[in-house]
């Protein structure tokens, strides 16, 4: 039986031009081209950081995993929103005779808002899939973050006052209505790293970053809002974008530009540990998570229904949701309700369940 590993990431513009960024942004918006001013802002951000190294770094990560596991698996790479696209790579895998595929998403935490976006492309009459849903608890990855933060504390912070700010990509608050485990995983991940450092709960905090302006409420506090709300600041802030593993725009701009600029304004020293990128500890984590999961059941995939229906809100999530009595209904869902000719539109399972919960599911 021919087996493969499919490593997947978000993607990035194929060229840093206005239209190159527009094409990428349009893919993110599911085929709806954003307004020109939105494209211009994102383009300017890419120019500010000198482009993005994400694809180069990811190809190196893939090659390093292949060097470790290539004798047993064919290793492939695909993006969610740029070339090579997941369906195209699956087509190549079929042509190569692959029968089983381990899907390794290069995001350590599970959120149906993000990871389910990969799962929905996993369709094949030939290949059975096994999706590794999360791998943030891998010891090698925890050690990476603890070691790199410890270096900053020892070599740069020394005896001065500091605060570690763990940040993670925000998700829409409606995700919590359906038991998305992402927030709990981020909190646990941060706690595990802090425990390795031997620090107290007062020496770190959790924030969120990189939310999109699509007309819906997102999980708070946003990292920039958190900084602005502080009445007093320590001598040092150590920013740890823990939901990411590679340098890309949401680290190089959202952290290294926006957070850095605010630190300059407040007279605080800005620090950020290097991203794992191609570090051997990250590769150890990726290889080990394959080993831990490789004997699980492979299946012909109906990912949205199966994954979504497994989710149950945690107590932490219920506490957050207690502040809002009603389901947060995004504008794009409202438009979907009003859309004419929707019988020709395949409704995503997530949206169907949201409408069902709100009592607004269109009649068949």
Curated annotation (Swiss-Prot):
One record GO biological process: heme biosynthetic process
Gene Ontology cellular-component terms listed: cytoplasm
Keyword Ribosomal protein: no
Pathway(s) served: Porphyrin-containing compound metabolism; protoheme biosynthesis
Primary residence: cytoplasm
InterPro entries linked: Ferrochelatase, Ferrochelatase_AS, Ferrochelatase_C
Keywords per UniProt: Cytoplasm, Heme biosynthesis, Iron, Lyase, Metal-binding, Porphyrin biosynthesis
Name assigned to this protein: Coproporphyrin III ferrochelatase
Organismal lineage: Bacteria, Bacillati, Bacillota, Bacilli, Lactobacillales
């Amino acid at each position: 039986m021919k087996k493969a590993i499919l490593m997947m990431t978000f993607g990035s513009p194929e060229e840093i031009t206005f239209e190159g960024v527009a094409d990428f942004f349009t893919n993110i918006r599911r085929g709806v081209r954003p307004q020109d001013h939105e494209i211009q802002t994102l383009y300017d951000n890419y120019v500010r950081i000198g482009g993005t190294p994400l694809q180069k770094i990811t190809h190196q990560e893939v090659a390093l995993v292949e060097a470790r596991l290539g004798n047993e698996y064919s290793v492939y790479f695909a993006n969610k929103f740029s070339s090579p696209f997941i369906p195209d790579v699956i087509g190549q895998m079929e042509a190569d005779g692959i029968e089983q595929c381990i899907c390794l998403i290069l995001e350590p935490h599970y959120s149906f808002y993000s990871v389910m976006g990969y799962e929905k492309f996993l369709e094949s009459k030939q290949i059975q899939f096994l999706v590794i849903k999360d791998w943030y608890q891998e010891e090698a990855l925890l050690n990476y973050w603890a070691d790199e933060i410890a270096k900053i504390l020892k070599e740069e912070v020394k005896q001065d006052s500091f605060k570690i700010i763990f940040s993670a990509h925000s998700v829409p608050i409606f995700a919590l209505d359906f038991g998305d485990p992402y927030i709990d995983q981020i909190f646990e991940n941060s706690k595990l790293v802090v425990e390795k450092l031997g620090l107290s709960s007062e020496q770190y905090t959790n924030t969120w970053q990189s939310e999109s302006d699509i007309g819906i409420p997102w999980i708070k506090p946003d990292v920039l809002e958190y900084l602005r709300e502080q009445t007093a600041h320590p001598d040092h802030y150590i920013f740890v974008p823990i939901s990411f593993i590679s340098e890309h725009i949401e680290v190089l701009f959202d952290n290294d530009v926006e957070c850095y600029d605010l630190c300059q304004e407040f007279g605080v020293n800005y620090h950020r540990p290097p991203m794992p990128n191609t570090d051997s500890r990250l590769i150890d984590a990726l290889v080990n998570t394959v080993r831990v999961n490789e004997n699980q059941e492979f299946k012909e995939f109906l990912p949205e229904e199966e994954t979504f229906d497994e989710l149950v809100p945690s107590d932490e999530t219920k506490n957050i949701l207690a502040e809002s009595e009603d389901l947060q209904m995004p504008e794009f869902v409202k438009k979907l309700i009003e859309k004419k000719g929707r019988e020709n539109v395949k409704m995503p399972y997530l949206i169907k369940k949201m409408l069902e919960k709100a009592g607004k599911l269109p009649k068949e």
